[in-house]
Amino acid sequence: MNTQAELLNTEGDYSLVSWSGRKFPGLLVQGDSLSILVETLAEAREELQKGDADEAQYAVDMALNTARSMLEAYERMMNDAGLNLPYSTE
Protein backbone atom coordinates (compact mmCIF):
# COMPACT_ATOMS: atom_id res chain seq x y z
CA MET A 1 0.00 0.00 0.00
CA ASN A 2 1.48 3.32 -1.08
CA THR A 3 -0.14 6.18 0.80
CA GLN A 4 1.05 9.73 0.47
CA ALA A 5 0.55 12.27 3.24
CA GLU A 6 0.77 16.04 3.11
CA LEU A 7 1.27 18.22 6.16
CA LEU A 8 -1.13 21.14 5.75
CA ASN A 9 -0.58 23.02 9.00
CA THR A 10 0.68 22.66 12.56
CA GLU A 11 -0.65 24.29 15.70
CA GLY A 12 1.04 23.41 18.97
CA ASP A 13 0.99 19.64 19.47
CA TYR A 14 -1.49 19.09 16.63
CA SER A 15 -1.03 18.91 12.86
CA LEU A 16 -3.51 18.83 10.01
CA VAL A 17 -2.57 16.03 7.62
CA SER A 18 -4.12 15.11 4.29
CA TRP A 19 -3.49 11.69 2.82
CA SER A 20 -4.45 9.93 -0.35
CA GLY A 21 -7.68 7.98 -0.27
CA ARG A 22 -9.33 10.19 2.33
CA LYS A 23 -11.79 12.96 1.52
CA PHE A 24 -10.95 15.09 4.55
CA PRO A 25 -7.68 15.76 6.39
CA GLY A 26 -7.13 14.28 9.81
CA LEU A 27 -5.67 15.61 13.02
CA LEU A 28 -2.28 14.25 14.00
CA VAL A 29 -1.82 14.24 17.77
CA GLN A 30 1.53 13.84 19.51
CA GLY A 31 1.81 10.55 21.37
CA ASP A 32 2.40 12.16 24.75
CA SER A 33 -0.72 14.32 24.35
CA LEU A 34 -2.78 11.24 23.49
CA SER A 35 -1.31 9.34 26.43
CA ILE A 36 -2.21 12.15 28.85
CA LEU A 37 -5.79 12.18 27.54
CA VAL A 38 -6.11 8.41 28.02
CA GLU A 39 -4.61 8.63 31.52
CA THR A 40 -7.07 11.38 32.45
CA LEU A 41 -10.02 9.30 31.24
CA ALA A 42 -8.70 6.26 33.13
CA GLU A 43 -8.46 8.42 36.26
CA ALA A 44 -12.08 9.50 35.80
CA ARG A 45 -13.19 5.87 35.54
CA GLU A 46 -11.19 4.96 38.65
CA GLU A 47 -12.74 7.81 40.63
CA LEU A 48 -16.22 6.74 39.51
CA GLN A 49 -15.51 3.17 40.63
CA LYS A 50 -14.43 4.53 44.04
CA GLY A 51 -17.61 6.59 44.22
CA ASP A 52 -15.83 9.95 44.21
CA ALA A 53 -18.07 11.88 41.85
CA ASP A 54 -16.32 15.22 42.41
CA GLU A 55 -12.89 13.89 41.43
CA ALA A 56 -14.40 11.99 38.52
CA GLN A 57 -16.12 15.15 37.31
CA TYR A 58 -12.85 17.05 37.55
CA ALA A 59 -11.03 14.42 35.46
CA VAL A 60 -13.85 14.30 32.89
CA ASP A 61 -13.77 18.10 32.62
CA MET A 62 -10.00 18.00 32.05
CA ALA A 63 -10.38 15.35 29.33
CA LEU A 64 -13.22 17.27 27.71
CA ASN A 65 -11.14 20.45 27.67
CA THR A 66 -8.30 18.56 25.99
CA ALA A 67 -10.63 17.06 23.38
CA ARG A 68 -12.19 20.48 22.77
CA SER A 69 -8.77 22.05 22.25
CA MET A 70 -8.01 19.34 19.68
CA LEU A 71 -11.30 20.00 17.88
CA GLU A 72 -10.81 23.77 17.97
CA ALA A 73 -7.28 23.43 16.56
CA TYR A 74 -8.63 21.14 13.81
CA GLU A 75 -11.36 23.63 12.93
CA ARG A 76 -8.96 26.60 12.85
CA MET A 77 -6.46 24.75 10.68
CA MET A 78 -9.22 23.56 8.32
CA ASN A 79 -10.48 27.14 8.05
CA ASP A 80 -6.95 28.47 7.46
CA ALA A 81 -6.54 25.90 4.67
CA GLY A 82 -9.86 26.98 3.12
CA LEU A 83 -11.37 23.52 3.66
CA ASN A 84 -14.87 22.54 4.71
CA LEU A 85 -15.35 20.54 7.89
CA PRO A 86 -16.51 16.93 7.58
CA TYR A 87 -19.33 17.65 10.04
CA SER A 88 -21.86 20.36 10.86
CA THR A 89 -21.11 22.88 13.60
CA GLU A 90 -24.76 23.84 14.05
Give the ranges of each region predicted by the language model.
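Short N-terminal "domain-start" leader segments
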Residues: 1-9
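Generic ordered-secondary-structure signal
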Residues: 6-7, 19, 27-28, 77, ...
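A short, structured beta-strand/loop element
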Residues: 11-46
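Short, charged, surface-exposed hinge/linker loops at domain edges
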Residues: 45-90
